[in-house]
């Protein structure tokens, strides 16, 4: 099984890294911002940089959609996993069109409402994981 782990740097990346017991023995690659914290955490991992800031702009969406198209066609993952943020959206929608399994993990610090990214990818995910049950989509 080949795994794509996609997310913003910082807390989102930390959430994905905490899944190490799941992904450590699988073929994998990461998609995140090319920032010092990400380079440090993923120094021994295959990583593709994505465009930032994503700040929900059309420009960022188009650039990251192009990146997603290239990376997904090259790597051909079986599953795409994300905990957000916006960079996950093009990877999930293109991944769905390519027949990939999609797993979204809503960040645990959201206690009363879902993230914007969570709401955007919810309709197409194969597994949507909410860490606190107070959230209603």
Regions found by a protein language model. Give the residues of each.
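An aromatic- and histidine-rich active-site surface loop
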Residues: 79-98
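An amphipathic, basic-hydrophobic alpha-helix
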Residues: 56-78
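Short, surface-exposed acidic-centric catalytic microdomains
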Residues: 26-63
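Active-site proximal beta-strand in glycosyltransferases
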Residues: 94-108
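A conserved, positively charged/aromatic
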Residues: 103-105, 113-129
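N-terminal subdomain of nucleotide-sugar transferases
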Residues: 1-33, 39-42
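Short internal beta-strands
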Residues: 28-34, 106, 129-131
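Conserved small/polar residues in nucleotide/adenosyl-binding loops
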Residues: 135-137
């Amino acid at each position: 099984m080949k795994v794509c782990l996609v997310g913003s740097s910082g807390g989102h990346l930390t959430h994905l890294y905490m899944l190490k017991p799941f992904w450590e023995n699988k073929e994998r690659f990461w998609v995140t911002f090319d920032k010092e914290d990400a380079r440090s955490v993923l120094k021994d991992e295959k990583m593709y940089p994505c465009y930032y800031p994503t700040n929900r702009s059309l420009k960022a969406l188009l650039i990251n959609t192009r990146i997603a198209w290239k990376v997904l066609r090259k790597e051909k993952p079986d599953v795409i996993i994300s905990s957000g943020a916006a960079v996950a959206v093009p990877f999930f929608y293109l991944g769905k069109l390519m027949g990939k399994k999609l797993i979204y993990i809503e960040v645990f610090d959201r206690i009363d409402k879902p993230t914007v990214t969570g709401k955007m990818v919810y309709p197409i995910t194969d597994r949507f994981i909410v860490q606190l049950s107070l959230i209603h989509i």
